[in-house]
Amino acid sequence: MWYCYILRNKLPQFKNNTYNGSTNNPMRRLRQHNEEIKGGARATHGKGGAWEICTMLSGFPNHINALSCEWRMKCPSGKPGKREGKYQGVRGRVSSLNGILPLERWTGKCIVDNMDFNLKLHILSDVVQYLDLTCVPEHITIEIVDVIDSSCVELDKEMYSFEE
């Protein structure tokens, strides 16, 4: 299973810093972003290791669809380049989902329509206010949680080492 996620930094000096990505192992990837293990993104490096997942969309049928969703989260307008100011920060990143989630396809590279599979959106209780729940299509289940951790993740435990 593949996941798309939005991270936020919990440190006051980096409170407006966000990052989004895709992975097949969110907890390992979070540890990388927090510099506990090798492999985090350049954008999250040197920011105090205080990243947390504030939204996580799961259920992608393949890596292509997950990467297409990741790109659309980075470019909510559908055009490459710098994100508009209204899509920056935690509020902007989460509110951009209002326009992204209802799309039939994230990009032209998607090989199936989004309505053809079920997705689940885990979202933190303190950011759900930025999501217009009326925009969320029926094939996406919403779970409002206080923390997004390993209990929100479904992994093939034989394929991945699963450490917290």
Residue ranges and their predicted role:
Residues 1-69, 97-164:
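GIY-YIG nuclease catalytic motif and its immediate N-terminal context
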Residues 34, 39-45, 71-91:
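Short arginine-rich
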